[in-house]
Amino acid sequence: MEIRKQYFKEKQYMWHKVRELQLKGLNKTQIGIYLGVNRKTVRRYLNMTMEEFVKKQSSHRKYRLKLENYEQYVRANLEEYPYISAARIHDWLKECYPDFPRVCNRTISGFVERVRKKYGIGKKVETHKRNYEKQPDTPYGEYAQADFGEKCMRTENGKSIKVYFFAIVLSRSRYKFIYFSRRPFDTGLAVYAHELAFEYFGGRPQKIIYDQDKVLIARANMGDLILTGKFQAFVKEQHFHPVFCHKADPESKGRVENVVKYVKTNFLTARIFQNVDRLNEEARLWLERTGNGKEYGTTHRIPLEEFAQEREYLVPYHGTPHSPGGEMKEYHVRKDNTVQYRGNYYSLPCGTYRGGETTVWLHETDGCLELYNKETGKLVCRHDLCELKGKTIYGEGHRRQRNIGAQKLAERILIYVSYNREVALWLENLQRRKERYYRENLEVILRIIPGYDKAILTEAVSVCLDKGIYNGESVKSLCGHIWKKKMRESDVGKNPASRTQSTGLVKTYNEIFRNNGKV
């Protein structure tokens, strides 16, 4: 309302100013230049009395939206694909409606945004909110949490390098230990970091909580986790119980997640890297004065003082840490997502190759080949070494599944037409005859679904099946023709003389197929 009043005041000022300048002897062109408006606007103000001006400003014309007829189509697509952009909607509208009016991009964006607000369709799907509960403190010496991290640092000459680290925290006292490495953690290096931590603590806890990290787990095995050989041997030797969180659930070990974040933001930020031994020494000093020496935020206790009590409950560690031998080597990833090693090709997940400079870390251990991501240091995959030559060894899930996505699209079409037998047969024939273009044809049909009911789509597919036509564009064209035909029939009512004859309909179908190059 305030905006409307301000707008009226500005117009009223303009009306009075135009007349004031006219009385001073200025013509329409001069008034327009002075006020920055067109001379036609000046003429309109001069020809309008005060009563006419007030009446015009008081009347509110309601304009019909140019794209109003397409609101339900846009709504249906936004509800199914809430992440879709206005530009993509514009393209679909032009594709499904040949007579779609020419409008600018801003008009489309505004219309799509209006539909989103009207029906409450956000761009991001709301995620499920998790309920939290504060857990009681665990007994001394029972639990610890461990995790891995990495961060880029600057050297003295300004070069950027990445360092990797292992972090472990005792759950009760919050007493921490960190160990840095210049290479990603494999199983051997992870075991060595555990041994250093046990030596630092002077003992070990009964249980340690981890992510389901490939460095420690060989296979998930439907919940019966199978540990890597070296880590399994280490667990048996030290007699502690490893506890693994659910996949993608880092919040179940929040204490060590906070430690990793604390190391990155407090210890590593703005620190110059000299060498890894110096970095580990600096980390020990930082733990003494800050990481373990300052009061913990939630317990309001100092971890170093709490650890004096927890140390008595730890199982004594009498071993000697042994540094693992064998350095990782950097290997180039081929464009077919494989690495060549000793005359064989070992696969990586589809999409690993990102250009000619893509590399991974390679490490051979215990008859296995481990490949690590160069950027994150995470274990990408593990292969058994092949003694033959010239073989390609594929990992589970590394080969592209070509038909799974298309099958899901076909299922959506069948659900829409209530599993009509003719549509199912047409889709089956389409897949057999045009396997390479099967998905593209399905996508065309899915895009027209919001614009036509299932009866129209079923009729169009039935005609194509009868004529042996297997092309999504032909189905789309037929749907448009059938829809227009039904609209004409609804307009003329039941007048037999105005109905399209069947021979004319067949001729129209043939013209559609000919235009698509199918007859």
Swiss-Prot record:
Boundaries of every HTH IS21-type domain copy: 13-78
Gene Ontology terms for molecular function: DNA binding
Source taxon at top rank: Bacteria
Gene3D superfamilies from the UniProt entry: Homeodomain-like, Ribonuclease H-like superfamily/Ribonuclease H
InterPro entries: HTH_IS21_transposase_type, Integrase_cat-core, IstA-like_C, RNaseH-like_sf, RNaseH_sf
Keywords associated with the record: DNA recombination, DNA-binding, Transposable element, Transposition
GO biological process terms held by the UniProt record: DNA integration; DNA recombination; transposition
Residue ranges constituting the Integrase catalytic domain according to the UniProt record: 135-311
General function of this protein: Involved in the transposition of the insertion sequence.
Family: Belongs to the transposase IS21/IS408/IS1162 family.
Protein name: Transposase for insertion sequence element IS21-like
Source organism of this protein record: Bacteroides fragilis (strain YCH46)
